[in-house]
């Protein structure tokens, strides 16, 4: 299906094992947020946004906010947790 193709193409953008694991961790985090807040996961972050975050590797709120699809509101709401995940995971994998 078109949706499966889109998903496959997105996942092909994740080159390294590190990126693939980080993608899984971010998806897990998104699912928890989704359950806590009662929003569907894609409202919190699309798969594309998760991939873009992984590719950009933002180090602070300013860099995170510049990623297309994040914006000020999402950065304010989820930024701290996203940056924490990125920081913790990069240390673990070095």
List PLM regions with ranges:
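Accessory DNA-binding and partner-docking regions appended to nucleic-acid-acting proteins
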Residues: 1-94
């Amino acid at each position: 299906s078109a949706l499966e193709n889109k998903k496959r193409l997105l996942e092909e953008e994740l080159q390294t094992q590190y990126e693939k694991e980080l993608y899984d961790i971010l998806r897990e985090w998104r699912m928890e947020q989704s359950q806590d807040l009662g929003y569907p996961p894609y409202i919190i972050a699309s798969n594309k946004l998760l991939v873009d975050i992984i590719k950009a590797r933002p180090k602070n709120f300013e860099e995170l906010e510049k990623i297309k699809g994040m914006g000020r509101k999402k950065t304010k709401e989820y930024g701290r947790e996203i940056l924490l995940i990125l920081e913790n995971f990069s240390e673990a994998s070095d």
